């Protein structure tokens, strides 16, 4: 069975997080047929650039598409998906608006690397670079979300108002707005638009 056929039979999964909690999925989100097919073909295409066999990649790696459509799931349930991929080599494929979040998860969990889809001149080389284990902290191309900003993003995603967040975080409402504004600058978008 080929790499592509392994993936093509699975991309009909309807529930994004249901798919994520299954340990037999290697490309999240498989319900995004274009991403799924494109990444599968790309990995086969870069076979000569990577040191590992395609079978080892299929078995040991998880490739996660951090796009604006799935971002709220990843923000609201980051503890769940991070524990679901424990023991796997996680590669985040980050769109422009999710780069700062990808960097946050890279710094704060066991992520192998980040492929910056929007900045890459040659995504094949970027992907091979990460798969081969060469991605390092020095390769981070942008700011990351801070822990405090992430807490405020999570609470905002849950529908909490700044006043409630300020009470929980034991800070002023002005501080909440400042952290939110800083996070939005790093994400190139208003938080509420990303988590709808």
Swiss-Prot record:
Question: What biological process terms from GO does the record include?
Answer: regulation of DNA-templated transcription
Compartment(s) where it occurs, according to its Swiss-Prot or TrEMBL record = Cytoplasm
The terms describing its cellular component in GO are: cytoplasm
Keyword DNA-binding assigned to the entry: answer is: yes
The ranges the UniProt entry gives for DNA binding are 162-181
Q: Does the keyword rRNA-binding apply?
A: no
Keywords in alphabetical order, please: Activator, Cytoplasm, DNA-binding, Transcription, Transcription regulation
Induction section of the entry: Negatively regulated by H-NS. Positively autoregulated. Also positively regulated by IHF.
Domain named HTH luxR-type is located at 138-196
Q: Which GO terms describe its molecular function?
A: DNA binding
Function description: Part of the ecpRABCDE operon, which encodes the E.coli common pilus (ECP). ECP is found in both commensal and pathogenic strains and plays a dual role in early-stage biofilm development and host cell recognition. Positively regulates the expression of the ecp operon.
Q: Which family does it belong to?
A: Belongs to the EcpR/MatA family.
Would you tell me the protein name for this molecule? HTH-type transcriptional regulator EcpR
Q: Which organism is it from?
A: Escherichia coli (strain 55989 / EAEC)
At the highest ranks, the source species' classification is: Bacteria, Pseudomonadati, Pseudomonadota, Gammaproteobacteria, Enterobacterales
Gene symbol?
ecpR
């Amino acid at each position: 069975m080929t790499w592509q056929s392994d993936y093509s039979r699975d991309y009909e999964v309807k529930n994004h997080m249901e798919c994520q909690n299954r340990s037999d999925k290697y490309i999240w989100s498989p319900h995004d047929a274009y991403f799924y097919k494109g990444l599968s073909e790309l990995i086969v295409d870069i076979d000569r650039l990577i040191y590992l066999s395609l079978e080892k990649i299929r078995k040991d790696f998880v490739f996660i598409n951090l796009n604006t459509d799935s971002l709220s799931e990843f923000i609201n349930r980051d503890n769940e998906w991070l524990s679901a991929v424990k023991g796997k080599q996680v590669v985040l494929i980050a769109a422009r608006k999710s780069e700062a979040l990808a960097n946050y998860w890279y710094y704060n969990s066991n992520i192998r690397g980040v492929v910056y889809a929007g900045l890459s001149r040659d995504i094949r080389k970027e992907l091979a670079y990460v798969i081969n284990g060469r991605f390092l902290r020095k390769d981070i191309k942008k700011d990351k979300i801070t822990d405090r900003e992430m807490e405020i993003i999570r609470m905002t995603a849950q529908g909490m108002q700044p006043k409630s967040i300020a009470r929980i975080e034991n800070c002023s409402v002005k501080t909440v707005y400042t952290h939110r504004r800083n996070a939005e600058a790093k994400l190139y978008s208003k938080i509420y638009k990303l988590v709808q």
